[in-house]
């Protein structure tokens, strides 16, 4: 094989593996956005969100919750992917994901990170708890209403309006 053939072979192999990776990510998006997955995750979080506190210290009770989450959600996603891609290998995909992490949409990568990164998992629960307790992100103090009409900058006495 000459250099040109090797380069062409490498390019076609790379393109095929990139296409396969992109297909898996597309399926993941579909699975994560599906109502069934949303319900599964929401029910799990409803069950445990009060256990989580926003402190530096991690309670021992978090570990079995984390392990149960991994078993439940990762198993569900893997089953869904196997239905769509016979022979799918989650371990191989996770390895490939590390090489392509900059190419994956933030929401998907963050969700996948909750399987392997305990702090991301804990943060997900803390965000959910804040939302459930009405402590979600409040942007109202940062909003300012301004008129787009030029006349609003003219004093009332000059634009024939009575106070």
From Swiss-Prot:
One of its GO terms (biological process) is positive regulation of tyrosine phosphorylation of STAT protein. GO terms for molecular function: transcription coactivator activity. Expressed in brain. It holds the Pfam family ARL2_Bind_BART. Belongs to the ARL2BP family. Interacts with GTP bound ARL2 and ARL3; the complex ARL2-ARL2BP as well as ARL2BP alone, binds to SLC25A4/ANT1. Interaction with ARL2 may be required for targeting to cilia basal body. Interacts with STAT3; interaction is enhanced with ARL2. Found in a complex with ARL2, ARL2BP and SLC25A4. Interacts with STAT2, STAT3 and STAT4. Found in a complex with ARL2BP, ARL2 and SLC25A6. The lineage of its organism: Eukaryota, Metazoa, Chordata, Craniata, Vertebrata. It is found in: Cytoplasm; Mitochondrion intermembrane space; Cytoplasm, Cytoskeleton, Microtubule organizing center, Centrosome; Nucleus. It comes from Bos taurus (Bovine). The keyword Repressor does not apply. The keyword rRNA processing does not apply. GO terms for cellular component: centrosome; ciliary basal body; cytosol; midbody; mitochondrial intermembrane space; mitochondrion; nucleoplasm; spindle. This is ADP-ribosylation factor-like protein 2-binding protein. Together with ARL2, plays a role in the nuclear translocation, retention and transcriptional activity of STAT3. May play a role as an effector of ARL2. Keywords: Cell projection, Cilium, Cytoplasm, Cytoskeleton, Mitochondrion, Nucleus. InterPro entries: ARL2BP, BART_dom, BART_sf.
């Amino acid at each position: 094989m000459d250099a040109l053939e090797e380069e062409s072979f490498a390019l076609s192999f790379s393109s095929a593996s990139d296409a396969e990776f992109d297909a898996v990510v597309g399926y993941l998006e579909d699975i994560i956005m599906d109502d069934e997955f949303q319900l599964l995750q929401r029910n799990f979080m409803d069950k445990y969100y009060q256990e989580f506190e926003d402190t530096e210290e991690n309670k021992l009770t978090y570990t079995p919750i984390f392990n149960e989450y991994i078993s439940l959600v990762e198993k569900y996603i893997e089953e869904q992917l196997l239905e769509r891609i016979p022979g799918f290998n989650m371990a191989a995909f996770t390895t490939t994901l590390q090489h392509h992490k900059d190419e994956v949409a933030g929401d998907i990568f963050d969700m996948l990170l909750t399987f392997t990164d305990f702090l991301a998992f804990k943060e997900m629960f803390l965000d959910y708890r804040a939302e459930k307790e009405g402590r979600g992100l409040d942007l109202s103090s940062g909003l300012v209403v301004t008129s787009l009409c030029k006349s609003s900058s003219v004093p009332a006495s000059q634009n024939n309006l009575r106070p």
